[in-house]
Amino acid sequence: MKVIIIEDEKLSAEHLAAMLHRIDASIQIIHYFDSVKSAVKELANGVNADLLFVDIHLADGLSFEIFSQVEVDTPIIF
């Protein structure tokens, strides 16, 4: 399973990634994004993931702003 993590706190992102790998070692974290801006820039090219883990409050705004700018059909866990 390919996963994208959108989280502005590096330690939290690393902790989530470690938990996911303990659950299933085959999970691939294919991208980390720490801001609305960086996520929009990359996700606008298409989402090549099976699941998104997204923090609601990012340093430059709410993560909901990402999905108002980019269409994403991938399941999202907030």
Model-derived features: positions:
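Conserved acidic carboxylate
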Residues: E7
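Acidic catalytic/metal-coordinating carboxylates
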Residues: L62-E65
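Active-site residues of response regulator receiver
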Residues: D55
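A short, hydrophobic beta-strand element within the central beta-sheet of small alpha/beta folds
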Residues: T74-F78
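Non-catalytic signal-transmission and effector/linker regions of two-component phosphorelay proteins
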Residues: M1-K2
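Acidic, metal-coordinating helix/loop segments flanking the phosphotransfer/catalytic sites
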Residues: A17, Y32-L51
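Two-component/phosphorelay signaling modules centered on CheY-like receiver
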Residues: K10-H31
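The feature encodes the CheY-like receiver
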Residues: A59
